[in-house]
C-alpha cells in the first residue's frame, strides 16, 4: 500500500502543527514548519549565510537566559535551550537550515526553522525524542518574541558584527597598503590626466594618497552604518506594541548580545518605525555602495596605469599572478583589479535590491526582509574579501616605472600651463598647438620661440615644482 505524506517510515517521523500532519526526516532537528517551507519555496540555491544563522542563535540563547532570570522559563529548559543555541551559534547545526531565501517576506520560516532546531536539540539533551516538543519551539524557544522583531534584529546583529570583524579590518588593510605606496612613490612625478587627456604633472604618491583617503572615508562610512544598525526591533513582537513580551526583555537580551559581539545594540526608540520600515538597512547598503564606487575607481585607475607592457600607459608594473590568455602566449592581465571591479558591480546591484526591499513595507511590517538580508550581508562579505585580496595580491606588489613617467611628462603639451601666468593663457595655448603640429615638446618649442629666458623656462617647466601649490598665479586650465 502506498504511504501518504502523514505516514511515518524508518526514515521519517510525523509531526503536527496547526495545519495538520507532515512527514519530517527522522534525523532532522528541524520540524514540521521548516518541512512545509522546504515544500513551499523550491526557488533557488540561496540560503542565509553563516552570520545570519549565528545571529539567530545569539538571540535565542540570550532570550533563554533572560526569560529564566525573569521567572518565565524553568532552569532545566533554559539550560537545554542555551546549549542547543550555542551549537547554532558555533555552526554545528548549519546543515539544519535548508529554507530558501525567497520565502515569506517576514522571514517567519527561518525564525521557526531556528526555533524547531533548538527545540529538538534541547529536547534531545533532556532525554526526549526529536519531535516530542519536550522543549516547545513557540512556548519556550520563541518566548517573548515574534518573527517580526527577531528577524530584523538578527539582520542588524549579523551586519554589525560582520562589519566589525571583517569589513573594517579588510578596509584598514587596504588603506594601509595604499598609504605605504603613497609614501614610496612620493618622489615620482608623472603626468596627470583629466577627461583621459594629458594634464599638469602630479606625483604618483599623490594619486595613491588620494586612493588611501577614499578608503579611509569608506571606513568612516562603515562606522556610520554600524550606528544606524545599532537600534533594533526586538521587544516589539508582532506589530510593535510589545504584546506578550516582558518590558525588561529586550534591553536585557541586547545587553548580552552586545557583550558577546563587541558591538552596541539597543532597543529601538520607536518600535513601529523599527518594524514597519528598514531605512537603516537601506542606509547601510548605500554606504557599502559608496565604498564599491570608490573601489571601482581605484581598481580601474590601477588597470589603466599598468596597461601595456609596451603599448599602454605603463607607468606602474602590476604583480604577475597568472597567465592571461589561452591563445596569446606571454600575456598577463590585471586579474586582481578586474576581480575587484566585478565585486563592485555586484555590490551596486545588491544595493538596488535592498532599496526595492525597503520600499516594500506595508503598514506594520516590511515584507522583503530575507532578500534584503541576503544582499546586504553578501555585500559586506564581498567587500571584505575583495579588499584584502586587492591589498595583498595587487597593491603591495606594485612597482613604479620611473623612466616611463619621466618620458611622458616631457612629451605632454599640458606643460605649457606653467607658462600661462607669465606669457598669458592665449600665448601658452598657441605654444602648445605649435608644439603639437611640429612634433616637438613644449620645452623645445618655447626655447625656439624664445618666449622666456632659458633660465626662467627651466624654473617654470620643472615638473616637481608643478606638483606643489605656489608659483606665479594664473589660470591653471580646466
Regions found by a protein language model. Give the residues of each.
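Conserved, well-structured ligand/cofactor-binding cores
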Residues: 1-478
